[in-house]
Structures are given as structure tokens and as C-alpha cells.
């Protein structure tokens, strides 16, 4: 088939070739233009785009004027037309962009040529040139002439522009414009490629986002490529240079081209959806994004949702430090036990007796289940025949659905499953844990379902049963938190290692990204795991927080009208990128053939031998005068190799999560003669390693990988550091049987193959079969990780549909354009819910009572009509009356407020711009800020609009915050469904829909209840003096109100919360719901304090029992 139709890469290039041919034709014409005429072409293209969509824009403006004064149904139709026209504008713009692509690409290519070939470019000065000259050294003004230099500072270094786009870069640029992923090898100039589609799409004025993996690159690239865009009158900024929620960041988003990191784009979106004033918003609509290192952002970072969290009153109330000694005791006992088991296993397996050997294999397997990372165990398993013997034992005990596995694990204190990232306490472990307490069931969850069932069968009065039930639930809640704390502490000790998954710096636990080796600033493990690690490391245990807003990067980037990306390594993940983002991967050919030599893996028996061989290879390469880049997978290994090199007297640089400040400088020097650089996987994404002629002659940059990573993509990224633009180079990986990947995923087949080949200590093995086995193990892990990311997305998709509804409604309220329509819809929904709840049961009395609570009106419907009409007719009748009542109350507020507003405006308009109007629902006073002039000119109508906005925003934020907490609890509790042979995701979808429906219904009722009871508070018979006082004090000027974001914090919450099914289910009875741990907003009452109800009992024995 590929011979007949060509392979995918060939078909992709065939599709793009016509565009490249047209660009070359256009370039011939553009080259002949003067510098001023070249800039003039940009203005012509911008106008052409606007002219193409001017009819639709005019129609939208006309519809927005028409919508005022229309009834509810007509308003909805008009706004639907507006939404449709806005989508049509975007689609039409894509058509015109394709038309002008050859000319736009030719303009930016020729601009690059002119900067490369001329020290200065002189053009007629515009206002933008004059503004640029104030803050940028590369532009100066001489009379009416703007002089652009061809050198400027980018990322702290002076750069001389010397780049012109190659043909393959024109291909890459076209692919990016089409909303695809361009895979380009390292050194092929991805940053320059991006200038083509960025320039073209920025001409629309809708904004282009260039997304990078770190703030150094976002700042550097905005400064490096910025002058090319600025020369043509486009504005460029970088969000990472400015504080969140600041005017400077707002301005950065309004620029034609905005650079920034993925996290900050996502967090700004969440902050915008917590804003209480339109002036707090920073982002525009999501138009077009180009994601640099797209695999890192959309795949690696997609496993960790973005979260904005805030303080919670019970945040300090934690048990980690209290139970730490108990857990340390269990961990220490397990270490001693497993060490002894290993010694006994070795003795028995050395015996000639087959039965003794079998017993030894069982002891070895038991030691493995208890402490799989024990270095002595790992070393022993690399000896001939040992691992294959243990794997056979494991197979025997896993047979028949692990019926006999308890014979292996009963002797242990806890069981570790590295593959599933879980730890489970055994009965023996629980006994040791509780040995310090008086209660043998101190750390055991009660069977709540059985206890409640037994209670229901008791023959006692209802009041006693209720009290007993409250006691059972309170006990379960306390014990559940206790068990959860112990489980997390156990995980912190058993599965997380310092200088591997995390580092401790400045008395803080900082997570290290497993893919890049970088510190993940601001990110914390979820579900108490981070606090557990803090307790383990004896640093300050931070307070727990509550989620206020959350989104996955996957769903954030799917909001863009058009999304594209570029990377050196995406082909291996092409399936995932298409499945989740509908992004096609196109492999762009290199400008020059790759001359790098990729050698077979060298496989050693132990890690010690492997590292010794790595050091010898480094010494040999340095003697040849070649630079060496050594890639490691953890901080610990980079430090080990550094110590070994120091012993040999070899100078070197280390780049890891602890030593990352001079990253760009170290990577830039990594190509010099005899330079040795040890780096975790963070090394050099986005930074080129350039070689001198002398180094090229010696053989180029040598890459040494000290371990295969779980992802083939990360290995390809490391190899790709060498061999840029046809340079010579080499790459090789050193692997041992003790490596993490080999230990977890190497099968019995590999172990027995090693034995057959007679693999002895000190020997090196280069074998195609083994290399393929390593690659198969990597594929297994990749599939597993894809499953985790897809699973996370499936859960977040449920959340996303709810988030869209809430955020759309919130945005309408914030902007105010559609607030009137949304309020009327809310009143209608409440009316419909009231009729639906009572009409079917013919409960007219219940309906009347609930109607007074919800809408504060008498029933306009008689009992006869209530029983004789259809539900739809009843809803319409009720809505008509509710609408009239609402309108009367709003008119009355405007009528009462306007005279006072008018007086303040007449006498103090020069002093005050805004005014606060107090409005109450009888329970609470809301101070509504509005523009003084507008309030006077609209006869008080603008006050009503501001009041509606404030109430809708208030009820949405309160309801959504509580809903997020309930959704978190639901997500954890549904995992038990898998033990009942049910699909947890399906249960989650059904339950979450019901939760959301109830939340919206309650939110609607709360909104309407406040609006329908609204009035301006007026004291009875006020004296003239009091009236004057109220006018001056109660109705006073108000400064511009802005949202205070300082009390919220951002974090990238680890996927850990989504992987806790096994441990939760293991410690919770089947069918029992996860305990609710309510986050309360009132002052905290101690459990031993007197109950505030006045009973004289302690709080824990009275109203505190069910908390």
C-alpha cells in the first residue's frame, strides 16, 4: 500500500508542497520591495482580513442594539444568532488566511533576510516605532526615520540576527498554520519556524499565544523573535514578565502576540473565572496557540491538573505528626524482617535440596513483596537463575485469583506494589500500629453498613436510633481520617525517595518532574500525601487547602479555536495526540542528513559495573577531545557520577533539580572541547549545543544515557541533543538489570535469556533481542501512562461539561450583556422545578408553602387549576406572576435609590465616580457598587443590573466551590464499585450528573430567593438628622473594586488522587460510601468545648457528634 500511495510522511509533504511553491513565487516579488513598502504590505494584509468579515461584524453590532426591549424567547434567538456569526467570522478568517499565507510567509522570510544582511534597516517612523524606541535599544528615532539594529538582547545575552528560513522551515510553518504538530529534529530551528504562522495569524488581531515549557524560554523567545514582529507594527509581550492579575499582564494578553508558560496560561483562565469585575479579566477569547515542546506540555504535564486552592478553617487540623512515630516503628520492623528474610532465602537457595530451594524462593518472594527497592535484594536478583526462580514462585501464588497469596504476605507488616504505586497494611502491621494505644481497633475502619443495618433492626425509639446512628457515623469519620493519615505516611516511606521523586530545599519538600528532572514550583501532591512526606522529612507540615477552581491542561488547550505544536519527538505519541486533541503529527524532513551514530545499548548485570563502565567511556571520550553529555534519570544518580568523576580528577558541570540556576549557560558550553556535562532529563530543551570546527573534526558531541527512561520519547530527546544540522556525533545507552525499568517490567523470558547466555559479573552484553525487550518494556509503560492520562481525561470530561455551563453563566453575569436573560431563565427554571415537584403528587398545600419560600409570592394558581391543567401551562402561569412581581420589586428599588443618587451626582459628581447602594433580602445587606453618572442617567436601572450581577456571581461561586468538594469525594468513593464488578466511571457519570442537577437547582433557588426579596433597607420614621447621616454614610462613594487573588494559591495537583482505588477499597467495607469531611466556614469549636446550643454537654457529645 505504501508503495502505491506513499507513506504518511510522503503524503503529508505532498499536501504542503503547493503552498511552499507559492511562497517561493511570492518571495521573488517581495525581495524587490523597499523597506517601507515591505512594511506597507503588512498593513494591506491586515485590512484585507477585516474587510472580509466586516458584514458579519456589522450584523453583530446591529443585533446587540436590537436585543434591548425584546421578550425572553426573542432575546435567546438573537444571542444564538450572535454566537453563530462569531463562529462564522473565525471560519471565514481561516479561508482568507490560507489565501494570504504565501505572501505573509514571504514577508517574514524576507524580513529575516534583511536583518541578517544589514546592520541597520531605516524606515519612515510611525507612532509605534517611537513607542518602541523608548523601551528597546534596537530601535532609535532620527527625525522622521526609525532605525532598526540587527542585534539585541535576548534571555540576558546579546544576539546578532543571522537566520533566514530554509525550505523545510517553510514546510514546518505551513503545518503549524494548519493546526497540526510539526516534528522537527533538534537544531532544525523550531523557534524560527514559529515566526511564520505566528505572524500570519497575528494579522487577524484576535491574538496568538506561543506556549513554552518554562519562563526562561518564554522570556527569551519573546525578546529573540519579537523585533521581527515589531518591525511590522505588531505588538509582542510575555505574561511571565508580569504579576498575575496586574494591568501589565492584562496588556500582555491584549498584544497581537503573547508568549508564556503553559501553567500561567491555564492559571490565568482559572483566575478569570473567579473574577468579580470585568476589569479583573486578563484573557481574551482563545484563538490560536502554538505549543513549543508540545509532547512535554500536552502529554507529560497533562497528568497533573491545574488547581487554584485557598485556605480552609480546618486546614491546620492534621494528624500526620501525631501518628508519625507509629508508622516509623512499623517501617523499621519491616526493614529488619525483610533483611532477615533475604539472608534466610540466600542460605536456602544455595542448598542442593530442591525443597530447601523452593522454601528459599518463597522467602525471597516474601522479601520482595515487603521491600522491593532493597539494594541487597536487587543485587541478588541479578545473579543467574535467581530472578527466574522468584518469578516462577510469584506465578504459582498468583494462580486462581491469588487464592494463596496470603501465605506469602501474612508474615509481613505491609505489602508494597510498585507497579500500582500502592501500599497495604496487613493484620500484623495493624497490630503493631495499635500496640501503643489502648484500643486494638484504633486504626481499623468499622463495618459501617453492617452497624447501620443492625441499628435499623433494633426495637428502640426513633430518637435513640438517630443518636446511635450519629455516633456510628462520627466514629467512622474519625477513624477514616486516622486510617487515611497512616496510609499516606506509609506511602511516603515505602514509595517515595528523597532526591528521586522529590528534594528538600530551604526546609520545603519540592517535587521533581519525572520526565524533565526539573523542580515543579508550586506543585504539591494531593490527598495529604505531600503533608505525609513533609512529616517524614521533619519539615513544617503545611496546612490543608480547599480547591476553588481546577482544570486539566488537556481541557484548557482544547478550548482554542486552533491549536498547533512543535517538538523533536512526537511520532511515538501520535496516536494519543490524535485521540485526545485531534492533532495530526507531521514529520518534517531535516535540512541536512543526520550524521549522528546511534549505537546499541550496552547491558550490564549490576548498576555498579554499569557506572564504572560509564566513567571509563567518559575518560576515553575526553582524551579524544570530544564534549560529553551524560543523561541521568534522577538527582541521586547525577550526584553519584559527579563524585566518581571527581575521584578521577575530571572537570565537569552538573545540571539537576538542585543546581538549575545556570541551565542555559551550562548547556550552551556543553559543546566545547573536552567538556563533560552531567544532566537529568531537563537538559537543554530549547537551548542549542553548538560545536566548534575542532570538536566536529574530533567526532562531535557524545551522548551517554545512564539508564533507559520509561518513555522512548525522552530517550529520543536525549539522543537528539547531538547531530544538529548534519553535525557528527554519537549516542549510546548503558543499562543494568538493576535499573528501575528492567526491575519492574523485565519478564521471566529476559531473566532466563540472560542465564542461557551465561552472563557473568563484569561482562557487557550488546544483543538485539535484549534491546528489543527493553523497547517492549518501554512500550508497556507508555501504554500504561496513556491509560492513566486517558482515565484522568474521562473523569475531567464529566467535570468539563459542568464547568462549561457554570463558567458560561458566570461570564454572562460578569460582562452583564446577557444578565437579564439569564435571570429570567433562572426564575423560569425555579417555577418549573416547583411545578414538577408538587403537580404529579397533587400536593397543592406543599406547593403553596414552598412557593412562598422560593419566590416570596402568593400562589396565582387555585387548587382547581393546579389539579386540572398540564405542568407546562402551570409553569407558564406561575412564571408570568413571578416575573411581574420581580419587575415590580426591581422598579421599586430603582425608584427609591434614584433621588438619593441624583442628589449625590448633582452635588458631588466632581469628587466621587462610584456609589455604594445597600440592598437587603431581609437576612443580609449587599453593598452594590455602581457608576454614579450611569446610575443617575438610567434612573437607577443600572443599579438593578449591578445587583443582579453581584447576586448571580455570589451564588455561583459559593455553590461551585461546594460542588467541587463533593465531586472530589464522589471520585474517591466510586472506586469501590470495581470490587462489585461495576464500572467506577459509569457510576461517577450518573452520580455526578445528579449532584450537578441538585447543585444547579439549589443555586437557582438561592439566587431567586434573594432577588425576589430585595429591597433598600429604610429605618422606620427616620429623623431629618438620621436621613442626612444615611445619605452621607450609608450611601457613600466607592473606589473601584478589584478581586483580591492574594489568598489563593496555584498548584499542579498530582495524579495521585486518581490512583488511590486499591488502597481506599482495601481499608473500607464494600458498599460503604467515602466519609464526608465537610469544609466549614464558621469559627472552629474544639471537640471538648461546651456545645454552643446551651445544653451544658461537651460539643463532641452533643451537636459535634456527626461532624
Curated annotation (Swiss-Prot):
It comes from the Bacteria. It is found in: Cell inner membrane; Cytoplasm. The lineage of its organism: Bacteria, Pseudomonadati, Bacteroidota, Bacteroidia, Bacteroidales. Residues 1036-1107 are annotated as: Disordered. The gene is secA. GO terms for cellular component: cell envelope Sec protein transport complex; cytosol; plasma membrane. It is a peripheral membrane protein. This is Protein translocase subunit SecA. May bind 1 zinc ion per subunit. SMART domains: SecA_DEAD, SecA_PP_bind. Residues 1036-1066 have a biased composition (Basic and acidic residues). Gene3D superfamilies: Helical scaffold and wing domains of SecA, P-loop containing nucleotide triphosphate hydrolases, SecA, preprotein cross-linking domain.
